[in-house]
A protein has these predicted regions:
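Conserved small-residue-rich beta-alpha loop and adjacent elements
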Residues: 106-171
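Short, structured coil segments at secondary-structure junctions
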Residues: 1, 151, 176-177
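N-terminal Rossmann-like NAD(P)+-binding subdomain of aldehyde/semialdehyde dehydrogenases
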Residues: 1-123
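N-terminal small/polar loop signature for handling phosphorylated ligands or for N-terminal nucleophile
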Residues: 166-177, 193
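Short acidic/polar active-site loop segments enriched in Thr and Asp
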Residues: 46, 153, 179
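Conserved NAD(P)+-binding/catalytic subdomain of aldehyde/semialdehyde dehydrogenases
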Residues: 177-217
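Short alpha-helical
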Residues: 48, 163-164, 188, 212
Length: 217
């Protein structure tokens, strides 16, 4: 992250900074309103709205990505890249396994009472993986594997439906053990995973990086 420091000694500089802050607030408010509109629309119209937004923003319809496609990507990538992904996956599994919590229940001093905690995995988790020019296979590993180690019932990965999906990202999904992979992105992907839409399931939790619109959604 690059930070630029601006020294404002005079009236004009301070006015400029105030204007910049005002524009930033306006931009953030617009992003939030846009995201809320998409969320509400998908909640009301389901897959019909998801398809419309996907065609509008990504020029492609949402679709399921077969596991054979993920496996094929893992076979196509350079051997040294696959080795790096597999070693990273093993390290993450080892680390996350050591962090697992345990359930503990015991009798309390109060007659008939019991206290403790029950550790239970979520039923379904969604993992958002950005598309475009950037590829984040490490993000796939870091988000999918902890869920798998924790015992989450189903891990669903979504990524924008670009014409040529990134092989490194798909290979990472295969290595990490993603249960389902769906080509859908943007605010509509977040909305679909939040409320459920046709073949896109409703999830208990959604993780992963995204742009300002995805984050707002």
């Amino acid at each position: 992250m690059i930070t630029n420091f601006v020294r404002a000694d005079g009236y004009e500089e301070k006015e400029l900074l105030a204007a910049m802050r005002s524009r930033a607030k306006e931009a953030n408010a617009l992003i939030a309103r846009t995201a809320q509109t998409v969320m509400d629309d998908v909640r009301a119209r389901g897959m019909e709205a998801v398809r419309e937004y996907s065609l509008q923003f990504d020029k492609a319809e949402p679709r399921e990505i077969k596991k054979s496609t993920l496996e094929g990507a893992a076979k196509r990538i350079a051997p040294e890249l696959r080795y790096a992904l597999e070693q990273s996956a093993k390290n993450i599994v080892d680390y996350q396994s050591r962090l697992l919590g345990e359930s503990h229940v015991w009798d309390s001093p109060v007659e008939g009472g019991r206290v403790g905690q029950i550790v239970r995995a979520l039923g379904c988790v969604g993992v958002y993986v950005p598309g475009g020019t950037a590829a984040y296979p490490s993000s796939v590993l870091m988000n999918v594997i902890p869920a798998k180690v924790a015992g989450v019932g189903e891990v669903v990965m979504v990524t924008p439906p670009t014409e040529n999906l990134n092989d490194a990202v798909l290979a990472a999904a295969w290595i990490a053990g993603v249960d389902r992979c769906i080509a859908v992105g943007g605010m509509q992907a977040v909305a679909a995973l939040t409320y459920g839409a046709d073949f896109i399931p409703r999830v208990d939790k959604l993780v992963g990086p995204g742009n300002a619109y995805v984050a707002a959604a």
